């Protein structure tokens, strides 16, 4: 893949553009797989004839299964993120870790094409790896923001990244909606095949468009060798951060509150679509598919409008 040590100065348009472009690349995962199409495929087609499955000699309800697997994935992320962040800070090379999660997540999205009830164990492994890849890459992606921008640019660049993510994900979801509704025109025999292809497209989109970001984002300290005790050094970096946090009770309370709020919110967002598929009477399966996807599309469009109509910090200061 393309790679180079960036020559772009901090705050440059090229560097900022490369950073925001990754939002365009990876946001299709959160919309197409987490929110829109995969929940329909999982509830409406994978578990069309049954509400439970046998895994390791245990009968598990389909809703309990996906909720538990998603929660388990977030626990892994909660453990790995601070440790890997400490390792990245120690080595001074965020890009290599970001690449690892991007490749793992995008390739796992390709694996979701073969998500079937008969192979539910390996299918769920792809689901977990895709979710970890998505959130793991965001740890390093977000940490780049203060490296490539000046403080006065941070809010504007962050908002631009969100906007790019919304526009990119909505664009692909529209393509997928057309492909699913008119599957015969695209050579598919059923909606199911069109849905499965949409998962693979997400993987290709994510992996392909992220290369532009990798090409221009700073690589870090090229000459730093990775020591044998790098894991221990990662824990040492965490210990330093922990001491800083413990020095302020207010900061500690804020982080605990944010942790509970953030993970609770993410859990609700991930399960909301499965609730919509199971509990809302949409009519026929095709009407259910179109209705849920269009509903999520409208939510995304509202978010885009809010991003472009909300006052900037500069406007607020003037008022």
Residue ranges of predicted features:
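Juxtamembrane intracellular "pre-TM" segments in multi-pass secondary transporters
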Residues: 4-12, 220-254
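Pair of pore-lining "gating" transmembrane helices in MFS-fold secondary transporters
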Residues: 13-45, 251-267
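Short amphipathic helix-loop junctions that connect adjacent transmembrane helices
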Residues: 36-60, 270-288
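C-terminal ends and interior cores of transmembrane alpha-helices
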Residues: 103-117
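Hydrophobic core of transmembrane alpha-helices in multi-pass small-molecule transporters
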Residues: 121-136
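Glycine-rich segments within core transmembrane alpha-helices of 12-TM secondary carriers
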Residues: 159-176
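Transmembrane alpha-helices of Major Facilitator/SLC transporters
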Residues: 292-307
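Conserved small/polar residues in nucleotide/adenosyl-binding loops
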Residues: 308-313
